[in-house]
Amino acid sequence: MKMEEHMRTDLKRVPTMKIFDFAIFTKSIEGIVELTIGEPDFNTPGHVKEAGMAAIANNRTHYAPQRGTAGLLSAISDDVAKKIGKVYDPATEILVTNGVTEGAYAAVTAITNPGDVILVPTPTFSIYMADAAIAGGTAVEVDTSKTNFRLTPELIQSYLDEYGDRVKGLVVVNPTNPTGITMNQDELDAIADVVRDKPIFVIADEIYDQLAYMEGADQYPSIVKSLPEQTILLNGFSKSYAMTGWRVAYMCAPKPITDELFKVHGFAVTDVATFVQDAAEEALRNGQEDPAAMRAQYQERRNVLYQGLQELGWETTNPEGAFYIFAKIPDYLEQDDEKFAYDLAEKAKVAVTPGSYFGAGGEGYVRFSYATDLNVIKTALDRLQKYCAARR
């Protein structure tokens, strides 16, 4: 008897993570330069590491409060209020999670009944498609390639017209992975108007918010500003503070929604390690300059990579946030993006991520990550130029 045949059938709908299989392949190639990395190449700031180590030395190694430590919850509330002007009650409207990955899982699981539809703008990282399937719902990919990779009210409305009352959630990732597109506040306000007063939750994934390149009042656009009562806000420390391995993030929502989210969070993970939360609190309280320093370097790298691709004749997005450029494969090269990426890795020793791994609209594109040293980017461009020249 094959016991795996008797497991939950919904899991067959969970997409496989081809991106990780591709990463294993590229790492096997000696001398390859990788523009595939989805995490900062910086190390966690020293003062944040010291706070974590001090917490361990002080025996902050026991169970933490399930919702989060009082200190971190308060710091999150203050930080969110400063950035987007919304005050969440630290005692009742915020949960500390094991990364945004867990927050996304808790959010989708908590709002989805069997048969419900979650609208997921694509191209995007596949986590929300998987979460919807695990929850017994259906992720419907909203292909934004038709609108220059920007989510528009008209595009959302077309899917609402098609799926009607089945739609339970809309995911809004801003800035976006893999395109780097960042919607401004006017765009987000218009999106909010489409779902306002409908029984539709907005899951606002803002993990890259401090890596947006706008300045002044436009630096932190958020759909929370115009639709707080329907929005579940997800954010964390992985991208802005180079803390991917610490696994700490948070979710914010009105108390009645947070109480339901807590049921999923509490039974799934119990809590986030106390010393990790102490380090995250240090990041928010005393590390406000850290994201800005990283952002300045990302901008320099973006400019070099963008200019280099333009000179090679590649059609690309010009990212306004995160650390990715999404580029259309030129017509004279292999148009199957997966085949192209494997060939480029083998023959030019340059690793980029196939666009189709990010869902509808990604076909024929590849993602370049500039979360790497400037010299690596220049080497990759030089190798790409030679690869392209040999195939014209």
At which residue positions do the language-model features occur?
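PLP-dependent aminotransferase-like
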Residues: 109-172
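Conserved PLP-binding catalytic core of the aspartate aminotransferase-like
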Residues: 298-299, 312-347
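Active-site phosphate-binding strand-loop segment of PLP-dependent enzymes
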Residues: 144-217
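PLP-dependent aminotransferase class I/II
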Residues: 45, 230-321
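PLP-dependent enzyme catalytic core of the Aspartate aminotransferase-like
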Residues: 158-161, 334-335, 343-352, 358-392
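N-terminal small-domain helix-loop-helix segment of the aminotransferase-like
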Residues: 2, 8-99, 106, 283-286, ...
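Helix C-cap/helix->beta junction micro-motif
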Residues: 29, 135, 197-198, 312, ...
